[in-house]
Amino acid sequence: ADMLINVVDASNLERNLYLTLQLLELGIPCVVALNMLDIAEKQNIRIDVDALAARLGCPVIPLVSTRGRGIEALKMAIDRHQQNQDIELVHYPRPLLREADKLAEMMVTDIPPRQRRWLGLQMLEGDVYSRAFAGDAAHKLDVALAHLSEELDDPALHIADARYQSIAAICDAVSNTLTAEPSRFTAAMDKVILNRFLGL
């Protein structure tokens, strides 16, 4: 893909940003369409769009799609945007990055480095579909997981929790609403369980 358009529900920013972070980690140019701002405003939710764009390292365009507000600005952003800023969006535990990078080194070189690391993390998280693109690295996954088991009890949970911590920090900086810490941890657990047992 040359460009990713990520439509985010402004009235439920924290939940929607999980996918946003995953897309941005791919390193593919991305434009975030911040939709349903009218609903967010009715719920007294305020979002600093410029601050959100700075945190994500990509354009964020406010939209009210039902009224056609922001559509032209979105088209313009799509035409002009060429590359996301190189920002470390998620602070993963070092053992996870170490094993993800080892897996990435075994993948074909025509896959960009950031996408190889992303695939490595997805594999460690338990995403079976990522193995189809990983080449020889797929055969070394068990070794990587064995190494991790000596330092981390559950790689998938640590990956999800790191992402939710980043999301919480972003929401705290750009919005007047923030879910409590226990709820974020529960959401991380839910994400892992859904991924493993429902294929979501």
Regions found by a protein language model. Name each.
Residues 175-192:
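Cytosolic juxtamembrane amphipathic/interface segments immediately preceding
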Residues 31, 41-180:
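Alpha-helical transmembrane helix bundles of large polytopic membrane transport and channel proteins
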Residues 160-162, 188-200:
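Hydrophobic alpha-helical transmembrane segments
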Residues 2, 165, 183-187:
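Alpha-helical membrane and juxtamembrane elements of multi-pass inner-membrane transport
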Residues 1-61:
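Conserved C-terminal guanine-recognition region of P-loop GTPase G domains, centered on the G4
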Residues 26, 54, 114, 183, ...:
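Short flexible coil/turn linkers enriched for glycine and charged/polar residues
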